[in-house]
Each structure stands twice: as structure tokens, then as C-alpha cells.
Amino acid sequence: MDSTGRAYDGASEFKSVLVTEGTSHYTPVEVYNILDELKTIKITSTIAEQSVVSRTPIPLSKIGLSDVKKLFDINVIKCGSSLRIVDEPQVTFIVSYAKDIYDKFMCIEHDSAYEPSLTMHRVRVIYSMLNDYCAKMISEVPYESSFVGELPVKSVTLNKLGDRNMDALAEHLLFEQDVVNAQRENRIFYQRKSAPAVPVTFGDDLEPAVRERANLYHRYSVPYHQIELALHALANDLLSIQYCHPTVVYNYLSSRAPNFLRLDDQVSLKLTSAGIGTLMPRPVVQLLDYDLVYMSPLALNNLASRLLRKISLHLVMQMVTAVQQDLGEVVSVSSNVTNPASACLVRMNVQGVQTLAVFIAQSMLNPNISYGMLSGLTLDCFSNFIYGACLMLFQALIPPSALTARQRLDINNRFAYFLIKCHATQATTASVVPNQVIYPVDAIDQWQSNRRDVLVAIYNNLLPGELVLSNLIQTYFRGNTAQQAAEILIPADQTSYGANETRALSAPYLFGAPINMLAPDARLSTYKRDLALPDRSPILITTVEGQNSISIEILRHKTGLIRAMYLNGFVTQPPAWIRNANSNTALLSRFLDVTPNLLGIYEAILANTYANAVNVYCDSVYRADIPTEWKLHQSVDPQDLLFGVFGIVPQYQILNEAVPDFFAGGEDILILQLIRAVYDTLSNKLGRNPADIFHLDEVFKVIEEIVSVLVQQKVDARKYFTESMRSGSFSKPRWDNFLRRPVAQRLPNLDSVIMTQADHVYNYMTQLTHIIPITDCFYIVKNSGFVDRGSTGPVMASSSVYENVLKVVHTIADFEAANALRLQRRSVDNTSYTDSLSDMFNGLRSISSSEFVRSVNGRSVFTEGRIDAIKVNMRVKFDLQFITEEGGYSKPPNVKKLMFSDFLSFLDSHKSDYRPPLLTVPITIGLNNLGETNSNTLRMRSEAIDEYFSSYVGAQILVPINVVDTRVYTEFSELRNFFTGDVVITDDPFDVWDGVKATYIPIGVHGVRLDPNGDQPPL
């Protein structure tokens, strides 16, 4: 139809258009009144849609240097003494682990002390850290012009860095000259300098004008430890694998356009004219394990839905009234006369033809997503010549996979029943019935419940003179012998439905090819192979010799069979419709004459599949092991072909919009591969199968969180492993089957690199465990505490003690051993009980609190020299608190302590736990900042001061002071050396284009020919 609404090539004036919306599975049906026969077929595909897959699983963001989270805290004190005045107190910088930084990875706040649980937790957290740290690229460092002597320099502006303002820290130094010198050295240390090299290696072959160069970057020395900058530095790697210059995108899109498409001119100009520093999401070459989609009902259902949305068929048809009028003249009856011929006149279903065409198209695109349920398939269905003829033609239009094996078997048996009833000689019937080859014609129940192929059995037991029956069956089986028809193509144990796929169940369909040897549409195979794309194509719907030619042989074979069935006479009593029914035979003759009209369906399908041939959801391989309940089912009525035969106008110009998805449709496949990859990662880290250690719910929770990060959407992994598309319950056998399957294809490079990156972060973080507040053991004592009021050292008091003053008298191996001691109870008297752990504790030697506080020189000294202790080998976390002691002593500090009774309560609360949580042990350290005061009060050995420091004494569960990882610097240069790291950033931030839509436009017209040698021979 042209833009004015008239048909082409002299056809009559356009009369009406019937548009049926229905559901998304249906497309508009165009209805015309066509008088002239058209000779030319031209099919074009109009494609204009975003057709490239580019993903940024870890999208990058920009932050300033001051936004970098700090791993270390700095405390500044001036150490004095409680026994004497110190004229020049030592300025000391204490560097300690900062709370809330990387704590999720280190399990500071929560998690089990059980080592595998800790490992799995850390693997999970790593991926959130990729977003929290590695995806945040430092893009701004404040700097200013200054001088070092007479030399002009660009120094980092320290006063914009908060508590990392090294100039402010230098002001704590005792002497003014030291302050000035330190600040001058800061300007020398923290400078902007030329970058030694390009930090971001994109690895693309770019033109020199748009290639990254070192002179576009600068290196900044900043007051951060390299550990604090390390994760942010990984952003460069994430940038290079997820982004590229627009010219790379242009080359990618141009090389991947099939020969009927080219990139839109405006898009091409925009991409090729992009300057240096411009980036786009990098196109992803996804060489995925496409067969995985057939292991998950959800993935298969999603793929089927996408496929159905891509079917766009425009069938050109005559007006229903015109067809009815024409046929009424043929059969010489009016529409109110009741017989099969007149009945068919009122049964012209336009929408039914469209439904059948869409069903045929989806069966060609992928034989594994759906199946048809034939309506009207009764035992005596072939006695209705309209139904029988339409069913035979329907077989010629569909691959065998379009129907279930059970339905195909039923068709064979219904055909066998018709042959025995109408065409078999009396001698044949007398031969095969007694030998139980078939059932008697009147044994209706046995025929209907039969589960064997009776047609093959008849074929194999025909009498030598039974030519009519032999020819009919041989024609039906496409010339195959009885032995060939009985050949098993797929054994029953390799099918989900437990039935043998024989050649007899494939031969009557399409080209007669076996169900496991359906020919793929190879028109675009060279294009796909050149790009290393998967060689997945729809089922070929044309002849193998002419890949864009539809052969009339498809239908000629079936029309010959229909003539033999209904018009060449009957050996036995004919069906009722034959008697005195000239109108019926006239209708059938006309029906067979115009059967080539059905090629119009193939024209529309071929136009659609040409574009779809590059899509990943296409497949020509039938997979018998896919459960039937996973597939979509659709009710189809073969009699709907009736209007298709009489009403479709073939050889008509079809303007068809068919948009290829290219890689789209592989999302679920990628998710399934990521699920497997994450599961394997957990297995490697744990050293065994995670399901052997944890409940599957725990494992899936970790898998889902990681995969959700990588695909940037919420993923419910369990939904991929159910019994069917309509079942929401998880199937353990499906999951086990998924794990047993060998990994056939590695992850796309993008995801593989990101997972490798995550592994690097994991290994890097585990190397930092020495600074985190977790230790492998703790001690139980009767009393503890430490006071050193007379020292000029940084630690003045503590709620714990040093490990060298502990005398281990008992060792408890682990939580289970401690729990067992607690459960070993015995009666003390008639009213009380004790347990072995309490007995062990009560046996420890007790030290008076006064020994921890009062001494001649202000330092704790014990009469016995050491403290009896029980060592418990359990992972615990410690909560470190600093109190700055400046000599006021006005109010005793609130020092947290853990008592033995608290430990007993912990055991009682978790006695049934296989994996207990971490016990938290508080440690409080009083820092010596007495150099800030000149008060004489602090040197008085009063009981009030002793009482003040007794607040530090009394803890019974402790982690030794020396376990706490702190760094003490008395020289400012040492502090500066510790906090010196390098950042290399671009002078001009990257310009990222996220909203560019890559569109294709068609090139030329691609024709589909009916029999390339010219005119069609009559049927």
C-alpha cells in the first residue's frame, strides 16, 4: 500500500483496513480487495532503534580529595609527668585505626567468629566496596601558588583538607621556629608536579589527536597514606574497561552492522568528531554461554517474551465479503444452505490467520519456547475434509517442534483411523485387526487412548497389493519407508516427556527434516562468524539451495496428498460429505488450486526473520530435554487456514519493520553466568562447596547481592531455578543440575576483569587485618588495670595490661571448649551449683586493686610480679577508647569494663549456636597530655587522685594493650612521611556521554523470490 492508500500495480482501489490490537502477540492485519495478480515481491526491513549493548556495572563518580574517607585518626598530646614539671614536654602524634572505615569488610560491627562465615561475608562486602570506594575517582585536588625560597611552586591547599591539614598539626609543635620549618617543608612535600605517565590505559588504537597524553595530567603529593588512596586508584582500571573514546564506539557499531544496515549519519558525525577527553560507555562483546537459557524456566520465559515482541508480520488479504461472494459462485449455494461447503463460507476468520502466522513465525525463530495445542483434533477429524485439508497444510507450514510429540502422535493415529475407515481394503482390515496391528474401527476408546504409532504399524504390515493405502502413507511420510519412519531420532530417556522421537513424527512437517536436524537460516552466518558472534539462527523456512527463495514444493507435496485422500475415490464407504455433494468437491478443488496463496505467510515470515537472524534468542536446534511445562502454549485451530488459502494475496510488496536486537536478550544468560561465577568464587575462597558449610538461603543471599551490583539491578537468583514458569518455589534438583553442567563459556571480558579486580581488593584488604580491632584470643583475670602517672610516655593509664605481665595458667581451645566447661555443672550444696569454667576462674590468684594504682613512682607494681590468667582462643573484637588526661582529675572517667559474669552470660546466650557472634571487649587508654598544664595538683600523691585512677581498674575480660595497633611519632617529619601519598588526575575532567542513542538505517531493498526460475507450476 502506498501513502495514498491504494494497492500497487493496477490493483483495485483500497477499500478497508482491519486493525486488530488484541494482545502484544498480534500485529495489524491489512485487508484489501485485490483484482489483479501481482508478480513482484519486495520486502524491506526498516530498522531504527538503539541496537548496541553497553554496560557500566560499576558506574564511576567524581570526588574531591577532601571527600576521601580516612583510615587513620590522629591524636596530638604533650607528654608531661605527675611527679615533676617537664619544661619541654614531648609533642607526640598517635595514629590509630579509624572506626567505621572498611568496617563492613572487617566485620567490626557484626558477624560470626566462624572463619568460613567471615570469609563469605568479606567476599560479599568487596562488591559494595567497589561502589563505595573504587568507583569514586579523585578528580580535584585544591592547590595554590606559593614559593619555596625564590622558586615558585604549586602547593596543595592544606587548609581545605580538614583534619589532614598538616599546617594545623604543625602548630602543635613546642617552638615557633619548629612550626615555621615544618610548614615550609609541607609546601615542599605536598606539591603539584608533572605526571610521569598516563594513569589511564584504555588500550585502544586511537588517532594521535584524541589519544591520552601525559601532559594532560598532573601528579599531586597529598597528606594521605597510600592505603587510603589505593582503592580510589583502582577507579582508573574501572574507567578503562567500562569507557572508551566515541571513535571506538563508532568503529564497533560500523563493523557490526549487517549488510542491510548502516549507522545513522548524524550519529556517525557526532562520534567521529568527538575531541580528546570525551568518553562513552564501552560496547560489550558478550560471548555468552547461550545454552544456559535452557536451564532456567524464568530465563526461557523472558527470552520467549522478547522473541514474541519482535515478531512483526503484515499479511495482505482480500475482503472477507469478496471471498465469500466468489466462493458462493463456485459452490453454487447461498450462505443459508447448510452443508460443509456453505458452512465454511461463514467461517472465514481473519484474526485466526494472523494468529497462525505469528505462531508459525515464533516456531521458526526458536523451536524451544512454545508449542501449539490443536483444537478439534478428534478421532474422526479427518472425515471433515475442511479440517483434514487444513491440518495437512498446517503440517507443511510448521517444524515438528511446533507441536508436542503427543499431538504429533495423535495426528498420525487420527490419520491412520481415517485410512482404515475410508481407504483400506477389506483384506487389509482383516489382516491387521486380528494380528493386533490396529484396533477395530468401532473400538473408539482404544483408538483414543492409544500411545503407539498405529500409522507406522499399518505401514509395516500392509499386504503386497494394498497400493492405495501404501501410496497414501508413503506420501504422508515424504517417501520414507516403514523402516525409516520407525527410526528413533531421539530416545525417550533423552526427552523430558519420555517418548521416542521417531522419523514418523517429523517427516510430515515442513521440509520433512528430522526434528533434530532442522536446517538453520544461514543468510547472515558469514557476517556473524566474521565478528566471532554465536552462530545461532532461526529455522530455515526456504529451500536450502536458495536461501532467499521460497519453493512451491513445500505445498505441492501436501496438495497431492489431499487430492488422494479426498478426491481420488474411496475403497470403502466414503464420508457423508462426499455423497450428493458436488458443491463440496467444487470447493475442495478450488481450495487446492489456490493453496499457493499460503506462500504469502512465508513471505511475511521471511521478511521478519531476516532481521531477527542476528538476535541471540533465535535457535534452530531442538532441545528435547526442556520440560514442556516451561514452554508457552497456544491454542490453534488448523481450520483458520481456510481464509488464508482463499484470502491471502501473495507476491505483494510488504513493507515490514523488523528491528534486530543484536545482543539484547542475553541479560538472563549473563545473570546465570554471574551466579555460577560468584558461586565458584565462594568455593575457591572457602576451599569447598559453600552448600556443605551454609544453608542455601545464606549462600543465595550473598550471590544475589554480588550479582545485583554487577548488573545494576535487583536479582532474585532463586527465581531462576523453579520447576516451571508458573511455579514460584525453588527447585533444588534444578540448582544441582545447573552446578553439574560444565562451564562452556567464560564471562565477558568486562565482568571477568571486574571480578578479578574484586579479587585484588579482597587480597589487599586481607593484608590490612593487622590494623583492625580484631584479635584471635583474649584473657580472663581476677583483676586488671595499668597506671603510669610518673612516666613521660604517651600512655598514662589503661583498663588493660601488657601481655608480658600475664601468667597463663589455663588455656581454653575455642568457643566449643569454653561452652563445654560452662555446661559441666556440679552441686555445691543443696541450694547452689557451680561449673568447671567458674571453678577455673575462682582458682586464679587475686590481686588487690590498690596494687594497680598506688606505688612510689606512680606506676603499677604487683607483689607477685605477674597476673594469673586464662587464655581463651576465640576471635574477639575490641572497642578502643582514648581519654586525654590533662591533670584536672575533677571527675573520674567512665571506663567500660567486661566482667567474667558478662562472659558467662555470653556463653549462656549462645550455647546452642554453632557459629557464635564476636564478643566485644572494651579497652580504654588514658593519654598523657599533662604537658599542657603547669598545675601542682597533679603531682600530689593524694588518695583522691588514686581514687580517680582506680576507674581504670577492675576489668576481668581483657585484650592486652600491645595488641592495639597504634603508631607513635615524636618527630613531625615521621608523621609527614607516614601521610604522604600520590594522586595523578587529569587537568580537565572527562566529558562522559551517557545518552547517545546509536541508530541504524536500512540500505537498499532485499527481495524474497518465489521459485527463482520464474513462473510457478500448477499444483
Curated annotation (Swiss-Prot):
GO terms for molecular function: structural molecule activity. It comes from the Viruses. The keyword rRNA-binding does not apply. Disulfide bonds: none annotated. Keywords: Capsid protein, Host cytoplasm, Outer capsid protein, Virion. It is found in: Virion; Host cytoplasm. InterPro entries: Inner_layer_core_VP3_Reovir, Innr_layr_core_VP3_Phytoreovir. GO terms for cellular component: host cell cytoplasm; viral outer capsid. Pfam families: RDV-p3. SUPFAM superfamilies: Reovirus inner layer core protein p3. Homodimer. Homomultimer. Capsid protein which self-assembles to form the inner icosahedral capsid with a T=2 symmetry, and consisting of 60 P3 dimers. Belongs to the phytoreovirus inner capsid protein P3 family. This is Outer capsid protein P3.
